[in-house]
């Protein structure tokens, strides 16, 4: 599936010590059985995703991007624990292998999970995927059905899930966080009119937040 999966050579700026990861996997009890082949998935703007293949395992490694990061963003431990907790009630989650919170291994936290084969949706579907109108409809309604299943899971039904919630305040945190990030990222050439329009939108969002509920 190499022409569909989109994994290619690891970008120089995103490379890491493969042997260090191999040694760490062995320490976690994963018998990798030989040399490790690492490739990087393109796209995405959050965390970096790699294919890690050995003679005995087909794995995925996730790590934060390099450079300056927003406070609280790219939390590998939280991402790992959410997926691990969803495995039993939801099912459509990869098996988690192990979480590394020791920056000394590759310079950042990371985690490894089993690979689940499938298509990574992008702006253009690959030529090998030829869907007629009926198939596209089934694909879209199927995706919606899965999202509905996911959002019907009660976080209080599992001790692992309930421990991950931050209670109320999700919308407020999002509005305040993204407004702050926008203000910090904008440059002098943005222009006064564009800044004023942006501030108007942010003020509207701040004033029209929906009623809060625990999440």
Describe each PLM feature range.
Residues 1-32, 36:
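Juxta-kinase regulatory segment immediately upstream of eukaryotic protein kinase catalytic domains
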Residues 35-200, 204, 208-214:
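ATP-binding pocket architecture of kinase catalytic cores
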């Amino acid at each position: 599936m190499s022409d569909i999966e989109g994994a290619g050579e690891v970008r120089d700026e995103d490379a890491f010590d493969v042997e260090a990861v191999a040694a760490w996997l062995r320490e976690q009890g994963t018998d990798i059985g030989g040399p490790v082949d690492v490739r990087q998935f393109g796209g995405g703007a959050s965390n970096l995703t790699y294919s890690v293949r050995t003679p005995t395992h087909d794995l995925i490694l996730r790590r934060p991007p390099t450079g300056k990061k927003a406070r609280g963003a790219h939390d590998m431990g939280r991402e790992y624990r959410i997926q691990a907790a969803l495995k039993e009630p939801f099912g459509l989650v990869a098996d988690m292998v192990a979480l590394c919170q020791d920056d000394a291994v590759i310079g950042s936290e990371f985690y490894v999970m089993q690979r689940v084969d499938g298509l990574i949706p992008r702006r253009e579907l690959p030529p090998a995927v030829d869907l007629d109108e009926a198939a596209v409809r089934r694909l879209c309604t199927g995706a919606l059905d899965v999202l509905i299943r996911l959002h019907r899971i009660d976080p209080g039904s599992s001790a692992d899930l309930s421990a991950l919630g931050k209670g109320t305040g999700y919308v407020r945190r999002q509005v305040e966080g993204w407004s702050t990030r926008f203000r910090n990222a904008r440059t002098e050439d943005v222009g006064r009119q564009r800044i004023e329009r942006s501030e108007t939108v942010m003020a509207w969002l701040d004033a029209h937040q929906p009623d809060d509920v625990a999440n």
